[in-house]
Amino acid sequence: MPATETADKNTKSANSDTSGRVVRVTGPVVDVEFPRGSVPALFNALHAEITFEELAKTLTLEVAQHLGDNLVRTISLQPTDGLVRGVEVIDTGRSISVPVGQEVKGHVFNALGHCLDKPGYGEDFEHWSIHRKPPPFEELEPRTEMLETGLKVVDLLTPYVRGGKIALFGGAGVGKTVLIQEMINRIARNFGGTSVFAGVGERTREGNDLWVELQEANVLKDTALVFGQMDEPPGTRMRVALSALTMAEWFRDEAGQDVLLFIDNIFRFTQAGSEVSTLLGRMPSAVGYQPTLADEMGELQERITSTRGRSITSMQAVYVPADDYTDPAPATTFAHLDATTELSRSVFSKGIFPAVDPLASSSTILDPGVVGEEHYRVAQEVIRILQRYKDLQDIIAILGIDELSEEDKQLVNRARRIERFLSQNMMAAEQFTGQPGSTVPLKETIEAFDRLTKGEFDHVPEQAFFLIGGLDDLAKKAESLGAKL
């Protein structure tokens, strides 16, 4: 794909007949009038100069609507403080573009492709438009290969697909960002490929923490970061995921690499779209969301895919408003996913981390034809025991555990051990717990849970299973409590 010019070059080369005038400013919404026959296309980037003292800057606007009578309605990607009516606006003739190439790794960019850690860096690189079509259908290649993470609960019950779309669902404060950072630590280190991180509408502090952690882990050199955080206008938060995805597409299509794309948080992308939709005066749809919600989500998700011989593996954090999974924002995301990991407040309250709900999480490749008969059998037995334990909760709460049959008592004790054994020390939480993160190979995970479901560890105290790694850790913890495996 041909390179596009940078914003500065576009501005300098603009002709007088591609300029218009600001006629209305309402927050981030700017109406611009152009000469007849020179109305810019939808998604074109426009530039306006703010010359008001300390607010002086070049403002980037994106065309969102054609209003008729040579008027266009645009959304600003920066604060419009200091912008006044009558200011000249230049049509660049192109949509917003971001730098691509191997050199973007190790740096932080914003949604416009401007380098934040080294101002001016990347302006002379090849640029790609952030508005691109997904690969043609005949180039797509479905993947069923498992991506091993070393987290027991994930590898056993919700195996991730290499080249697939994975989402971490959860309400506020249940550990989505920590788990995303954990996956970056684990997969980026073991994966050895290129990673792209999109910070969409989340906390600036978390972005800074991630930057420092990646440097300390020596993974930053293989990672490109693109941020549009909470304090940014809705136009930026709506486009930052596309900017990061465009960089990832270059690594997939031009460099022929397998790429990891992390997005935190996909709900903020939807939320920004809702804000923009309201600002543009569109009639809201269900629960106040934009009527174009499914289209906008599809445009993003359809580009995250595997083509012949190369892939983009996407891991997305999804905030669930008020823990309501029927909310249109998370519900629209479900349809595009290969694996879902649901973080539960009830699991979190037990102190089990990661707080994954094993009964609510799922994966399309948890199938004997993909993961193998043994893995599938053990996973289904674990799910059966946990489901039966859940069914017995009401009886235990009302009548007490003593009223259960001997068989059910044994199952409950086994289920409590399974629950605790699904917890694990995480690398991202080392500074809080003082315990090093543990990685458990898939083969060992399957063997350990197979023995656990068969009752081989029924004599081991429950607390021995809490926040440990594999069988070696279990043996040490059991011995410290006066038991042997």
From Swiss-Prot:
Location of region: Disordered: 1-20
GO CC annotation, single: proton-transporting ATP synthase complex
Species this protein is from: Mycobacterium avium (strain 104)
EC number from the UniProt entry: 7.1.2.2
The keyword Metal-binding is assigned to this record: no
Source species, domain of life: Bacteria
Pfam families: ATP-synt_ab (PF00006), ATP-synt_ab_N (PF02874), ATP-synt_VA_C (PF22919)
Presence of keyword Transport: yes
PANTHER family membership: ATP SYNTHASE (PTHR15184), ATP SYNTHASE SUBUNIT BETA, MITOCHONDRIAL (PTHR15184:SF71)
Subcellular location, principal: membrane
Signal peptide start and end residues: none
Bias (Basic and acidic residues) ranges: 1-11
Membrane topology listed for this record: Peripheral membrane protein
UniProt protein name: ATP synthase subunit beta
Cross-referenced Gene3D superfamilies: 2.40.10.170, Bovine Mitochondrial F1-atpase, Atp Synthase Beta Chain, Chain D, domain 3, P-loop containing nucleotide triphosphate hydrolases
Reaction catalysed by this enzyme: ATP + H2O + 4 H(+)(in) = ADP + phosphate + 5 H(+)(out)
Keyword entries, A-Z: ATP synthesis, ATP-binding, Cell membrane, CF(1), Hydrogen ion transport, Ion transport, Membrane, Nucleotide-binding, Translocase, Transport
Cell compartments where the protein resides: Cell membrane
